């Protein structure tokens, strides 16, 4: 594949995973299938992560409290992505928490209204990520914390591809099913790319052990989430993809903060 093909796939992946505008010409003749496109998810996550990272850098430069700066950075990230992954986390929490059977869980997840489990999941997601990011700022440096955001964004988007490829669609008429199953080669490429991107950012900023802890946390979280969803829903949905991203992001930030 040419470098241009990877660049185009990355731009399309950014458009799929966020609200960042991309040139319409990139989608001429594109059928919307994501089988090969998922290989670019870590690169898209990296680019998406630079936006909240800049917000964090700006606020820390203005001597804002680390926790306030972290919360604002996460808010910026949610705006950039349209809260795509947070929505998936909330719907998955509502479905699994409120559904007594697979079928009931899927019906609840399809409901756009947020329930108690979803609200609690969102609150915990923002609170834990903000606390971990603030701890990283306090125990390392502002620049290191800034680099952590795109690194974790790349890792968590790579984890999506594992979850997606390893599980069949839970619903034949679901959004995730309509975009196609990721190619196994594309999934493997995404996992390797996610690890390398994380290494390039985390190792120089934090050292080897925090890098190892981050990789282990992302891998373990993605694996456990996939096994759990397989048992409860027997397949993935668009919501479980978002939930996987959020859980991996939470786990990785916590591991990074703890390893410092």
From Swiss-Prot:
Q: Which InterPro entries match?
A: CobS
| Claim: Transmembrane helix is one of the keywords in the record | yes
A single Pfam family it belongs to is: CobS
A Gene Ontology biological process noted in the UniProt record is: cobalamin biosynthetic process
Q: Where are the transmembrane segments?
A: 40-60, 64-84, 117-137, 142-162, 189-209, 210-230
Q: Name one GO molecular function term.
A: cobalamin 5'-phosphate synthase activity
What is this protein for, i.e. what is its function?
Answer: Joins adenosylcobinamide-GDP and alpha-ribazole to generate adenosylcobalamin (Ado-cobalamin). Also synthesizes adenosylcobalamin 5'-phosphate from adenosylcobinamide-GDP and alpha-ribazole 5'-phosphate.
Matching HAMAP family: CobS
Protein name per the record: Adenosylcobinamide-GDP ribazoletransferase
Provenance organism: Rhizobium etli (strain CIAT 652)
Organism classification? Bacteria, Pseudomonadati, Pseudomonadota, Alphaproteobacteria, Hyphomicrobiales
**The encoding gene:** cobS
